[in-house]
Design a protein with these regions (language model features):
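Short acidic loop-to-helix transition motifs that present clustered carboxylates
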Residues: 1-3
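C-terminal subdomain of the subtilisin-like protease fold in secreted/lumenal serine endopeptidases
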Residues: 91-131
Length: 131
């Protein structure tokens, strides 16, 4: 995708915008993989987005049929992974503010060596996040 391809609500400074990594439709950069369909920053206001990336490749998820599962890929799979990690963080540190959470994510993501408009702070590292 082209720069400036992150859309609302992801362009907000207050939103944690999650990109997708590790998919079969990927671009190899060194040893790191970034999907070639995940939106790229910056925003029109020159805000670096996405904030971070998380795995979103071939994730088992609920299907619309009763008692069924399906395999999906994309930021719709990456974002719940980050949300779950944040829930674990807030369980461990319940007094954290939204700013604290964003700062902690920023400090603990693993740099993939990609441009910031593709990876933001880097790849979610749950183990480091919860230390």
């Amino acid at each position: 995708p082209a720069p400036l391809s992150v859309t609302t609500p992801g362009i907000s400074r207050k939103v944690i915008t999650v990109g997708c990594s590790d998919d079969h439709m990927e671009v190899l950069v060194g040893k790191n993989r970034m999907v070639d369909y995940s939106g790229r920053g910056p925003t029109m206001a020159a805000v670096c987005k996405p904030d971070l990336v998380a795995p979103g490749c071939s994730v088992a998820s609920c299907a619309s049929l009763r008692d069924k599962y399906t395999i999906k890929s994309g930021t719709s799979m990456s974002t719940p992974i980050v949300s779950g990690a944040i829930a674990l963080l807030l369980e461990k540190y319940p007094d954290m503010t939204n700013r604290d959470v964003k700062l902690r994510l920023m400090e603990t993501c693993r740099d993939m060596g990609l441009p910031k408009n593709q990876q933001g702070w880097g790849l979610l590292d749950v183990e480091r996040l919860l230390r």
